[in-house]
């Protein structure tokens, strides 16, 4: 058995409880990950309150992103037990149980292997934030090296990631913030 935060239906945040479920069993194309950390996203708040897509069903273990260590794989997997992986989206926490658990079963296609000595709490904040910033720059804006981009909210976590990614990709990045005291923050991250 393992600890999970499983929602039986819509609830307030103070009604969420730790409960027990069996450890999920590996199947072809999927792997079991020991979850070490996960980010908490606004979309999960909508799911918790019953405001998700009509396809979202209860009971459900939330969590659309996470980081951890591969615990078990199916025969023929390209992953190995003990590997560090990040994982996000692809139905995680919506169509099948997510990262608010000690172990989660994920399709291999959403796993991103990495190696890091950073602490798990830091790593756990990176996956979805990075995907959002990257997707905004590259897919939504179609920005490329040499372009100048404006990042509104340049002191938010996603904004700072967009600044860093944009600079690293060869863009000139201009960033805004509402707070005068925070003006140096995006500049320290590389904004012009």
Which role fits each region the language model picked out?
Residues 18-23, 67-69, 84, 103-105, ...:
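Conserved hydrophobic/aromatic beta-strand scaffold that supports enzyme active sites
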Residues 22-39, 51-92:
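Glycine-rich beta-strand-centered segment in the early N-terminal region that forms part
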Residues 126-192:
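Mid-domain Rossmann-like dinucleotide-binding core that forms the NAD(H)/NADP(H) cofactor-binding site
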Residues 1-5:
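Short structural boundary motif marking the start of a folded domain
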Residues 43-49:
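Cytochrome P450 core scaffold surrounding the K-helix E-X-X-R motif
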Residues 87-153:
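NAD(P)H dinucleotide-binding glycine-rich loop of Rossmann-like/cofactor-binding domains
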Residues 13-19, 51-52, 131-134:
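Short gly/ser/thr-rich secondary-structure transition/capping motifs
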């Amino acid at each position: 058995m393992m600890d999970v935060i499983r929602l039986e239906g819509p609830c307030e945040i103070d009604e969420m409880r730790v409960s027990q479920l069996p450890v999920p069993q590996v199947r072809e194309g999927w792997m079991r990950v020991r979850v070490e950390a996960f980010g908490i996203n606004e979309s999960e708040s909508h799911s918790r309150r019953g405001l998700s897509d009509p396809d979202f069903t209860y009971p459900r273990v939330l969590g659309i992103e996470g980081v951890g260590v591969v615990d078990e794989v199916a025969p023929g997997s390209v992953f190995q037990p003990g590997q560090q992986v990040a994982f996000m989206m692809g139905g995680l926490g919506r169509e099948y149980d997510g990262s608010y658990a000690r172990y989660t079963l994920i399709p291999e296609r959403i796993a991103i292997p990495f190696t890091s000595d950073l602490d798990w709490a830091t790593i756990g904040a990176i996956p979805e934030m990075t995907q959002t910033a990257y997707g905004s720059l590259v897919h939504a804006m179609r920005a490329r090296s040499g372009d100048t981009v404006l990042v509104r909210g340049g002191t938010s976590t996603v904004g700072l990631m967009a600044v860093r990614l944009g600079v690293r990709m060869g863009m000139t990045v201009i960033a805004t913030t509402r707070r005068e005291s925070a003006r140096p923050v995006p500049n320290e991250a590389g904004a012009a």
